[in-house]
Amino acid sequence: MLVTTSVGIALAPGDGDTAATVLRHAGIALARAKGDGGQRMCFFEHGMDKALQRRRTVEHELRLALGREEFEVVYQPQYDLATERQCGSEALVRWQHPVHGKIAPGHFISVAEDTGLIGPLGEWVLRRACTDAAKWPESFIVAVNLSPAQFRDGDIAETVAQVLNETGLPPERLELEITENLLINDTEEVLGKLNRLRQLGVAIAMDDFGTGYSSLSYLARFPFSKIKIDRQFIRNMTRDPAMRAIVKTIIALGKSLDVTITAEGVETQEQAAMLREFGCPQVQGFLYGYPGAADLEGMAQSGKVTPISSARSSAA
């Protein structure tokens, strides 16, 4: 059993002139500490009560959205640089709010994780992605993100096995993406779950590589089949020699470990040319396609990709 401690602090008289007010503000600070991941203390700041109310509103609307099926899955294509052909897509969830329109995951995923809603939401995304991918060409994979909270709660291997069985998608065509944050705590338990997933035949990818801690030790210990280079390195490598050297080294490391490398956030022809020169196997980014509905016709043709020459930066 893992026991964690979070502390919320409010001071009198600055944070309230009555005991009831100070206690209420301390409770708000405690909720903020837990919402930021726990195992920390947080001092009350004016405005937190409004932020907490907004968060509770999002939580309430999230619960309604799950029942109303207001979510949709969009796909961003991934390409093989050597053949210049699409090899798969990453599944990304969007919330189609009846009032506010399309909402990106950055505005609701953290709330889903803190409230336990990430479990049913994540399973819904996994099932939808596998259902869609079963209709794609047999050579195409689908990548699905797993949050740390989703991974820790319950038996993720059993859930994945059940979804694969229901949808008929071969396990080798499913790739599960996790971030380094998942590997920091409970490493033995995480390793066991990852090994069970690999035994199913599912591929495991480390997402946002280079943004966390002890990345190299993770590569030696955990059963990864792919590394995704974080977009910050790709964005800066054409003008920063240090970033360029890091990208080149990661690609070489992948070859040595027999691990596929995918460069995220490719937006310019210059970046693509440099990655091709370095021998990067796969790319993903706005240069090659924005997240959207899966192009079944384009997949069936599996022709060479024509990069979007006027790709613009926007939130994926």
Predicted segments, located by residue:
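Short glycine/serine/threonine/alanine-rich loop segments
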Residues: G38, L117, L169, V202, ...
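Cyclic-dinucleotide signaling modules
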Residues: M1-R56, H60
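Regular, well-ordered alpha-helical segments
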Residues: I28-A31, G35, L64, A134, ...
